[in-house]
Amino acid sequence: MKKTLLAAALLAGFAGAAQAETSVTLYGIIDTGIGYNDVDFKVKGANADDSDFKYNHSRFGMINGVQNGSRWGLRGTEDLGDGLQAVFQLESGFNSGNGNSAQDGRLFGRQATIGLQSESWGRLDFGRQTNIASKYFGSIDPFGAGFGQANIGMGMSAMNTVRYDNMVMYQTPSYSGFQFGIGYSFSANDKDADAVNRVGFATADNVRAITTGLRYVNGPLNVALSYDQLNASNNQAQGEVDATPRSYGLGGSYDFEVVKLALAYARTTDGWFGGQGYPVAVTLPSGDKFGGFGVNTFADGFKANSYMVGLSAPIGGASNVFGSWQMVDPKLTGGDEKMNVFSLGYTYDLSKRTNLYAYGSYAKNFAFLEDAKSTAVGVGIRHRF
């Protein structure tokens, strides 16, 4: 009996030591609901004799990944001694309505990184993950970089869900509230829709990306700066090669306890990063395609100033209400119309891991097209594990 107890104690000790050296965590989010989306726009005929092209369609049904994208992932660390750790994160996005993989069918499309970290010098990662702007502005956006059309990425394309493949990223620890990050991608999108022409053997045959930023977080104050740049591949069309999309971002929030105020500004030139893109893709009678800018779009001469004002407030101990206004003033888009987005959201916590949500968003001059409108509303449930 004593030998059995001794053996059990030794095994428990070994298990504890192993656990202290290596840790692997399974985590995830399931977000599903019911929603309605209506898109209405008209394109004038190219000539006086041409009829206008009208588009007015709506859909009602299941929605998923609204508050946060549905996902599952593995996060691990190994203690290497002297405060140094090996780290990895594999995160797979999926559609909780039908079970399909997200992020163009990638197995770990949300994140696939391995690296080293230390409390003294920071963290170095290799692989696919979000850019610095997405990391730093998510906590400033009243919608937490979620809720589809309502989030900050609708008007400030580099600030939400922009992911780069083949990236080396370094982030410092937090020094008195300050943190700096920088990353470089050798090939930003290996699953480019035009992979034959845009992904090649030579380094310059691939779209490359730079992302960097600085933030300050101290108590109720949160301030962030960011910069992103795309370098065209040699195989792209001439107009695209001449373009070097850039995005500059500045934003901040302050929590007054009864209400939290958020402000943000972005300047985008020569293209659109479009981490989420627009939900409409239509081929016009002329053969031209309409649908706003997609992911990592190159457009020489394009310029846009974007603004966001947001508020959020707790109601009781379990509810939050939040809203924002975004405006994008573009140039050289073909339409050049100012886009305004008005959004309102609400969450109710059923527990620490499960909550209900509702939101509504209305966009005028949607995708920079005159009188184009997009309305999105939805209710759902989110569970974290």
From Swiss-Prot:
GO MF annotations, alphabetized: porin activity
Subcellular location: Cell outer membrane
Signal peptide: 1-20
BP-aspect Gene Ontology terms: monoatomic ion transmembrane transport
Alphabetical list of Pfam families matching this protein: Porin_4
Keywords: Cell outer membrane, Ion transport, Membrane, Porin, Signal, Transmembrane, Transmembrane beta strand, Transport
One GO CC term on file: cell outer membrane
Stated role: Forms anion selective channels.
Annotated family: To bacterial outer membrane proteins and porins.
Protein name per its UniProtKB record: Outer membrane porin protein BP0840
Species this chain originates from: Bordetella pertussis (strain Tohama I / ATCC BAA-589 / NCTC 13251)
